[in-house]
Amino acid sequence: MTTKKGMKKFDPIAYKEMVKSYQDEDNPTGWFDSIYTDAQGDHSAVFWADLEPSPYLLEWLKNCVFKHTGRKAIVIGCGVGDDAEALSEYGYEVTAFDISPEAIRLCKNRYPDTTVNYLVADLFDYPSQWAENFELVYECNTIQVLPGKYRIQARDAMVSLLATQGYILVSCRRRLKGEQEDDIPLPLIKRR
């Protein structure tokens, strides 16, 4: 498999085996931290990271009919921080979280002067003050890798973060033809 410059070679078999081992232990999100830890502090070594904001998010921000300034946004599974930083640049007060402590460390090191509030948190057990607190709830390429029952729980949790009259924006990569819904998806398959 061709990799981005500076990335370790991605082994899809080892990846699927590793994810399956966590899922077999009913720990559907535990494997995320191992990917970030394996990157050894190099955000470009996280094989699913695009290292730029989602073009779909940027398009939405540019075409949105309301002002962004002063609104609260939350980024679920923020990864290495590109989307959170884009939202901040558009004027949002951004809380961005990931279940991986190592991902949050990468964000803070990558963006040392940021105004984004990067936190370690679990979508299934987030701080109570987050409930119904955000005008924008943004999720990109995270819940798609969860097994079915957890995707349903994740959708419910996302809705519970949303303030009245707020927006949920979800962006994900589609599965390949023939892939089953609960198959462990291989990352970085993009079609535009």
Where would I find each of the regions flagged by the language model?
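Class I (Rossmann-like) S-adenosyl-L-methionine-dependent methyltransferase catalytic domain
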Residues: T2-I74, G79-W130, L146-R192
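Local beta-strand N-terminus motif with an aromatic residue
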Residues: N133-F134
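A conserved beta-strand element that flanks and buttresses the S-adenosyl-L-methionine
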Residues: Y138
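Short catalytic micro-motifs in class I SAM-dependent methyltransferases
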Residues: N141-V145
